[in-house]
């Protein structure tokens, strides 16, 4: 059957190149393997040449697949399920790339693209290590190609093809309108592409419609992909039994991987800070943790590699750390994409990701089991110096620091893997007769504190070690030399810490941790300052000011600033939006929001918020995204020195779902940020006011009844002084002071105003929002009576409920990330 309006050529080319990439990567793997195993240079050279052609072909195919998929998405070819599922016509062009990584297929493709880039460089740069290293990378490419091939083997689906058409996907099978005669057992209509629901796509997840999500995933995936290079070198060393020589070639690659992966992780933190509404940048989310763990182990591996380079110690540990860093990249992929995390993560893929459960387990097994077999088989042959390191040597304390990083990673991944542990125990309970297998391990009630109470001590130890260790020499250090070098930085650090702790008002108190946890926070801040000052001083004391040779010290300065920024911004985070309006908006029991920490702003009414007067001025709808609204919140400092506008936004009833999806906004200063996001809005369809005013002529002391109670006119005040009104001396104004008594016994005070300004009469109404009551003072009668207009409406007026924080010293964190990456890049270049 010929279907109308379909564009089949891009998909046909895409499927062709997927098959080519699958076959070419397998050929490259086999040919590189044969090159390594060849007994003579002639055979080895032949196989290597074939492998290169195959890998170049595979790379071209992957780039072509990427380009074709982008063509389909950008041209809104909704006959393809991937384009329909992840994009729409209203999507801004700058977010089209983000459609790639919303789905499984696109993110695996992005990973594969970076492997191609790395492999093409290594074909020239790896020299004699090319064949064994590229065997590993080519095999990884084969595994990734199976993720997008989308074929059935022995009744099991292998991968998910991004070029599947809507009519092939099964999506239309239960849609009667898409079938001939409205019969789902009949063929799909030839003109199904002209049906209304096929004219636009399902749209991109609103959380991904942010500029950070255009740049964060490519950087993060480059970091993930690059961890295969030190892994491949370690694997090659074990395979070729050339245990130490590979380290020199691997070091700059490991540094590159650490820098890019670290920046990618913190870009994710920046995205969370600007796009998510939990009021921060790190929540110990399982997927955040799963990306952090490979980085921690990679950093540990870099330091043990440096120990080996200078002393010959720790080569075995270096092999292990590089194997584990790549292994945990695969494991993090397993956690993210199989749905095993369920609703414990805001990042996790679900749905079709469940089909990858065994597929990714196989990938992990094929990659890691051979590596561990080689490691343990060659363990005794890996060079190891029998003599223990001296306690006064640099390598001893570097190893301790590496071990702390490793143990920190194990603790984090252990807590993160609770859903996996519960699933394993549940599976075993049907096989083994042990009662404890039926007991699921519950996550901690306060997840953030459960991590923080351990990681604060990791931060303290690492901060101290980064400050001290560079002042030690490899192999041995005399105490006289050490104390002479370290004395001045230590005195400066103690002085700085004393000033910060004495005058910095570090008052972070957690009810679970008590004053012991507060003391740990103080100690962590002091040690972070020590790391910054001691490493900055070492650039001049140890390196004589030669920045080109000081990459390690610069990276340590940056890392100290990261720790300091985290501790200061978290311990001094201040809620600004305490409820001063008297309007309480209830939250669901499942919400983490507290009514007293959220301020409700009625449109046009100024409210008190800390050091600011804030006013909800107006709102506007996004020109393309009709479900997205921007809300203009005016801030004015009470001392009159500054005023500014913040524009938090929210998606309202996205795809028919109730509630809102807020996007924060923030005002940046050198020493703090003001951070605002919306927590509640009236539903737009409920905000249409159809009620009308009813006039009441009354005198002071009279009573007016309304549905839920009554109100008494207490007095009429001439020329009232009120912050809400801005009258000049030439204006005339009267305010009616009214007390409202509800049936529930609650009292409210209203003060509507009648005024004459520039010879024009006007009025300012007042509301009792919780009573749906609006009162306007519209006229003064000759007999000392006044006319009040009263209205009861289910939509009194527009309002927003928001939460606002002050994040102090958040820029210390961002600066630390940049400086850390800069230091690592300097070390890599050196």
Regions found by a protein language model. Give the residues of each.
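Solvent-exposed, non-transmembrane regions of integral membrane proteins
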Residues: 1-830
């Amino acid at each position: 059957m010929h279907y109308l309006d379909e564009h089949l050529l891009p998909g046909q080319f895409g499927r062709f190149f997927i098959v080519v990439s699958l076959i070419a990567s397998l050929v490259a793997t086999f040919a590189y393997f044969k090159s390594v195993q060849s007994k003579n240079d002639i055979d080895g050279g032949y196989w290597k040449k074939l492998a290169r052609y195959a890998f170049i072909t595979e790379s071209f195919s992957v780039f072509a697949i990427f380009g074709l998929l982008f063509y389909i998405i950008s041209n809104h070819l909704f006959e393809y399920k991937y384009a329909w599922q992840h994009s729409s016509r209203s999507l801004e062009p700058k977010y089209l790339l983000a459609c790639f990584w919303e789905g499984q297929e696109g993110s695996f493709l992005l990973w594969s693209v970076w492997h191609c880039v790395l492999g093409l460089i290594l074909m020239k740069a790896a020299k004699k290590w090319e064949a064994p290293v590229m065997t590993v990378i080519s095999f990884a490419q084969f595994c990734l190609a199976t993720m997008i091939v989308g074929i059935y083997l022995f009744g099991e689906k292998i991968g998910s093809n991004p070029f599947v058409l809507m009519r092939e996907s099964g999506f239309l099978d239960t849609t009667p309108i898409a079938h001939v005669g409205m019969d789902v057992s009949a063929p799909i209509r030839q003109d199904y592409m002209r049906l209304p629901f096929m004219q636009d796509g399902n749209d991109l997840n609103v959380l991904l419609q942010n500029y950070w999500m255009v740049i964060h995933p490519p950087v993060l995936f480059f970091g993930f992909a690059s961890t295969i290079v030190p892994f491949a070198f370690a694997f090659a060393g074990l395979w070729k039994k050339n245990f130490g020589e590979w380290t020199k070639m691997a070091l700059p690659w490991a540094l590159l991987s650490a820098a890019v992966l670290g920046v990618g992780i913190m870009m994710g933190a920046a995205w969370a800070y600007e796009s998510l509404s939990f009021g921060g940048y790190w929540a110990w989310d399982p997927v955040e943790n799963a990306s952090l763990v490979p980085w921690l182990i990679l950093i540990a591996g870099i330091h043990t590699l440096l120990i080996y380079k200078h002393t010959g110690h720790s080569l075995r540990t270096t092999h292990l750390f590089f194997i584990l860093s790549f292994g945990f990249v695969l494991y993090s992929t397993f956690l993210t994409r199989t749905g095993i995390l369920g609703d414990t993560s805001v990042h996790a893929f679900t749905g079709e990701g469940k089909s990858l459960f065994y597929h990714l387990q196989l990938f992990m097994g094929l990659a890691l089991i051979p590596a561990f077999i080689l490691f343990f088989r060659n363990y005794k042959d890996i060079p190891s110096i029998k003599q223990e390191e001296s306690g006064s040597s640099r390598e001893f304390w570097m190893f301790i620091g590496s071990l702390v990083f490793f143990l920190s990673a194990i603790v984090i991944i252990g807590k993160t893997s609770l859903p996996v542990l519960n699933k394993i125990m549940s599976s075993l309970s049907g096989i083994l007769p042990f009662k404890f297998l039926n007991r699921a391990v519950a996550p901690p009630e306060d997840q953030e504190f459960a991590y923080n109470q351990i990681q604060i001590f990791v931060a303290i130890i690492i901060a101290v070690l980064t400050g001290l260790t560079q002042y030690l020499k490899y192999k041995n250090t005399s105490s006289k030399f050490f104390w002479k070098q370290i004395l001045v930085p230590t005195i400066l650090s103690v002085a700085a810490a004393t000033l910060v702790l004495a005058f910095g008002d570090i008052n972070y108190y957690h009810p679970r941790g008590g004053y012991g946890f507060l003391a740990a926070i103080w100690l962590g801040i002091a040690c972070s300052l020590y790391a910054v000052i001691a490493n900055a001083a070492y650039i001049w004391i140890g390196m004589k000011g030669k920045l080109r040779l000081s990459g390690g010290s610069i990276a340590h300065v940056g890392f100290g600033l990261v720790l300091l920024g985290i501790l200061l911004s978290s311990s001094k985070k201040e809620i600004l939006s305490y409820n001063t309006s008297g309007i309480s908006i209830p939250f669901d029991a499942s919400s983490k929001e507290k009514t007293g920490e959220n301020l409700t702003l009625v449109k046009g009414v100024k409210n008190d918020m800390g050091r600011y007067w804030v006013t909800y001025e107006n709102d506007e709808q996004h020109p393309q995204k009709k479900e997205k609204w921007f809300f203009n919140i005016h801030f004015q400092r009470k001392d009159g020195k500054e005023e500014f506008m913040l524009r938090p936004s929210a998606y309202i009833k996205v795809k028919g779902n109730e509630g809102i999806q807020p996007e924060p906004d923030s005002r940046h200063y050198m020493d703090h940020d003001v951070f605002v996001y919306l927590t509640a809005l009236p539903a737009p369809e409920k905000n249409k006011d159809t009620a009308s005013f009813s006039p009441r002529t009354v005198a002071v002391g009279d009573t007016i009844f309304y549905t839920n109670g009554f109100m008494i006119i207490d007095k009429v005040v001439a020329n009232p002084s009120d912050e809400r009104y801005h009258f000049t001396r030439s204006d005339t104004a009267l305010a009616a002071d009214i007390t409202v008594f509800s049936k529930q016994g609650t009292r409210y005070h209203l003060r509507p105003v009648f005024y004459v300004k520039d010879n024009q009469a006007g009025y300012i109404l007042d509301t009792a929002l919780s009573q749906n009551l609006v009162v306007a003072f519209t006229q003064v009668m000759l007999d000392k009576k006044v006319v009040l207009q009263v209205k009861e409406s289910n939509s009194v007026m527009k309002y927003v409920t928001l939460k606002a924080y002050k994040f102090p010293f958040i820029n210390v964190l961002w600066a630390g990330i940049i400086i850390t990456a800069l230091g690592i890049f300097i070390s890599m270049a050196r």
